[in-house]
Amino acid sequence: MSVKIRMRRMGAKRKPFYRIVVADSRAPRDGRFIEEVGYYNPVSQPKELKLDEDKIFEWLKKGAQPSDTVRSFLSSAGLMAKLHDEKYNK
């Protein structure tokens, strides 16, 4: 089972709201997921992003692969650098 960290679209038409979830890669975008680890609201000013860093870090250590967009969010939050440091600077 390949696990991905990706965004799940919520909200109304033309008013998107995304939940960042851990899901099986074979599940549909808005389908079944394992755990919710954050959210992103692109409509609000300023854009709102909340990440549960502890949960995300645990899933990344277990081998979950983030989508490209989620990877950019994690990089801006400093989680990818933290994971890299822990993995290679033992």
Swiss-Prot record:
Pfam families: Ribosomal_S16. One of its GO terms (cellular component) is small ribosomal subunit. Transmembrane segments: none annotated. InterPro entries: Ribosomal_bS16, Ribosomal_bS16_dom_sf. GO terms for biological process: translation. It comes from the Bacteria. GO terms for molecular function: structural constituent of ribosome. Keywords: Ribonucleoprotein, Ribosomal protein. NCBIfam families: S16. Belongs to the bacterial ribosomal protein bS16 family. This is Small ribosomal subunit protein bS16. The gene is rpsP.
